[in-house]
Each structure stands twice: as structure tokens, then as C-alpha cells.
């Protein structure tokens, strides 16, 4: 019989504040609230998808009902309350998905439940996910209970769209804004999971997944699971990752810039042709090339080098290539990429449109040299 597979996002869901990734400002505030007994009656957790809102709500619910808090105010995971919570058998935590239970009757049922004190533990916690989906009537039915709930009731509302929540609800809650998670934090967490799962993972591959996830850890874990499955389960390489995610290998951008600096139009066009044959879109290529030029520009100054989030090996390549490019070349190339990007969709022959931009870029070093020479000549005459 096949063993049930548990996705990484569930298997490695944090069980205490310490293991939450990239939300230190939130976890510190919540732990201090527990430590100083300054718990509000209602919290609003808002931020992008997959950054830990529901996870933090569950950890807070478990921690405030824990019978034997640790020295640093974390749940013990040993007492009856923690065990019941970990087994999804706690009567003190109620979760409501407002996306599917958004009517005024659903909220009235919730308000009726609030009247009953907890049988065991100190607090009854009500977690309402996707709270922005509640109807206006449901919000209004909820107002009085949210403002003056019984002392044992705590509400935690979670949303990705704070602007859709009516001001009267916002004013009754302590608002916590969750950040997008940094690429480094996601990559480190993926490295930890790969180690736990005994998977050989290349750092470049993990960084690529972290970048693709756009600050959402849950998305990163889903991509990680997908690529591990694709690669037969014990190895995760950069090449398999770019193949699976259909991302253009950044090595192509280095080759294109080398050819541009050498003013080799034929080579540039051949590389672009190879990229198109692999099924990549010309528009995405020009956007990627402009990002590459931006990264080279950033590498020109040691003060800004931290602005590019790549592995150390890739950073060395960017540094080497940036030394071969003048600021004038990079600015002019960025300008050409930008014009090509803006005009791409209006073009009747999009391939030629990109090729023309690349040919102009290939002649930039010569144009810059001639301009510098002309400037020197004019100075001599003066």
C-alpha cells in the first residue's frame, strides 16, 4: 500500500514562533504581548499570500492556551492542550473560512458560539481566514461582539486584501502587516528542508525557486515539491529547475552581452535564434536582458552590490562582466531595452523588432568610442 505523501508546506508548517520564517517583527510583538499579558481581543493579520498569516494565528492560539509555557514564551507541545491542538482535536480553536461562510447567518452562528466559555484552557480563539470575503451585513453583525467580546474570547482575522475591510472593523483590531519573505530566507529554509529530506540540492536551484516564488514561502515549497518529483526524488539541479519552470538560463544573458561588447552582430542573432527555438518568448527575453543590464550596473559600485540577490558564484560572474562594460554602454543598452519592451506589443514583426534593438546595442561600443574621440578633438581645438 502506498504511503500518503504530505506536501512540504504542511509537513514543515512551523509549530512555534521561533520556526516562523521571515516575520521576526510579528513573532517578537506577539511573544511580548503574551509575556506582558497585553493580548488584544482582536487581531488582524494582513499581507500577501503564503507568508505565514494563518500559521501565526494557529501558533498564537496554541501558545496562549499552553499550560506549561517555555522560558522564552513558546508553546511546550507536551501539555494536554498542545497535544489536542497538534492533533486537530482542540475545542478551544475554531477556524472559519470566510470565503465559503460569508453570510450574515454564518457570523450569527459564530456569535452564538462565543457565549460559551472554554471547557478546558484559558481562551477560545476564533480564526477567520479570508475575512475580506464577508458581506457588509456579516461585518455589521460582527461589530459588537468584536468590540466587546467575553474575556475568554480572542478573534484573529486574516486577509490578503486589507482595503476591502470596512473601517469600523479595522478600528477594533490590532493590525499586523506581514512582509513578503526575502529570497535569502526562502533559500535557507529550502536548504533546511532538502537536508531533512536527504535531497542533494544545488544552491543555484534553490535560489531560482526562491526568486520565482515572489516572496511567498508556500509557493516556493510547492515548486520545490514539483521539481523534486520531476527529478526522481533525491537530487535537485539548476538545469532541471530551469527546464521545469521554463525559465531562460541566465548564462544566455552573459553570452549575449559578451557578443554585444565584441560588436559581433552575427553571434548575437544566432544566440537569440537559439533562445526562440527553445520556445522562449522574445518579450520575456528583452525584459530578462534589461534586468541583466540593471544587475551589471548595480555591480559597478561596491556600495550597491548587495542589491543583487544571487549566489556568490553568480555574483563573481556579474562583477567580472560589469568591469568590461562602461556606464555609458549600460545606460544606452538599458534605454534601448526599455524602448523595445514598450513598443513590443504594437510591433507587426516582433522578432525583427528585438533583433533591431540587439543590432543597435552591438554598435553601442563603437558609437561611444567615436563620441569620446570627437569630444577629445573638440577640446584640442579649444
Which residues does each predicted region cover?
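Extended, largely alpha-helical regulatory/partner-binding modules appended to the mid-to-C-terminal parts
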Residues: 87-91, 106-109, 122, 158, ...
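P-loop/Walker A NTP-binding region and its immediately flanking N-terminal helices
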Residues: 1-175, 193
Amino acid at each position: 500500500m502506498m504511503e500518503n505523501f504530505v506536501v512540504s508546506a504542511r509537513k514543515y508548517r512551523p509549530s512555534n514562533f521561533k520556526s516562523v520564517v521571515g516575520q521576526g517583527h510579528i513573532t517578537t510583538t506577539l511573544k511580548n504581548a503574551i509575556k506582558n499579558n497585553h493580548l488584544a481581543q482582536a487581531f488582524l493579520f494582513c499581507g500577501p499570500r503564503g507568508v505565514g498569516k494563518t500559521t501565526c494565528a494557529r501558533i498564537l492560539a496554541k501558545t496562549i492556551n499552553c499550560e506549561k509555557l517555555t522560558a522564552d514564551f513558546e508553546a511546550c507541545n507536551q501539555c494536554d492542550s498542545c497535544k489536542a491542538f497538534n492533533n486537530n482535536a482542540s475545542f478551544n480553536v475554531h477556524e472559519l473560512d470566510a470565503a465559503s461562510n460569508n453570510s450574515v447567518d454564518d457570523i450569527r452562528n459564530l456569535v452564538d458560539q462565543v457565549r460559551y466559555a472554554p471547557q478546558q484552557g484559558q481562551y477560545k480563539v476564533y480564526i477567520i481566514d479570508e475575512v475580506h470575503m464577508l458581506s457588509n451585513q456579516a461585518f455589521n453583525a460582527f461589530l459588537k461582539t468584536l468590540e466587546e467580546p467575553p474575556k475568554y474570547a480572542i478573534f484573529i482575522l486574516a486577509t490578503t486584501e486589507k482595503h476591502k475591510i470596512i473601517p469600523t472593523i479595522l478600528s477594533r483590531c490590532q493590525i499586523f502587516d506581514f512582509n513578503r519573505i526575502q529570497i535569502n530566507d526562502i533559500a535557507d529554509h529550502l536548504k533546511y528542508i532538502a537536508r531533512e529530506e536527504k535531497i542533494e540540492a544545488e544552491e543555484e536551484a534553490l535560489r531560482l525557486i526562491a526568486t520565482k516564488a515572489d516572496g511567498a514561502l508556500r509557493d516556493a515549497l510547492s515548486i520545490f515539491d514539483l521539481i523534486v518529483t520531476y527529478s526522481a526524488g533525491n537530487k535537485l539541479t539548476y538545469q532541471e529547475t530551469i527546464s521545469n519552470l521554463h525559465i531562460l538560463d541566465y548564462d544566455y544573458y552573459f553570452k549575449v552581452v559578451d557578443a554585444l561588447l565584441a560588436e559581433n552582430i552575427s553571434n548575437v542573432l544566432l544566440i537569440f535564434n537559439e533562445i526562440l527555438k527553445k520556445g522562449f518568448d522574445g518579450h520575456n527575453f528583452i525584459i530578462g536582458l534589461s534586468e541583466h543590464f540593471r544587475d551589471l550596473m548595480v555591480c559597478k559600485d561596491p556600495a550597491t552590490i548587495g542589491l543583487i540577490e544571487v549566489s556568490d558564484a553568480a555574483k563573481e560572474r556579474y562583477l567580472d562582466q560589469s568591469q568590461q562594460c562602461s556606464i555609458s554602454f549600460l545606460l544606452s543598452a538599458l534605454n534601448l531595452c526599455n524602448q523595445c519592451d514598450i513598443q513590443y506589443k504594437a510591433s507587426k514583426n516582433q522578432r525583427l523588432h528585438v533583433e533591431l534593438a540587439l543590432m543597435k546595442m552591438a554598435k553601442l561600443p563603437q558609437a561611444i568610442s567615436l563620441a569620446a574621440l570627437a569630444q577629445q578633438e573638440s577640446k584640442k581645438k579649444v
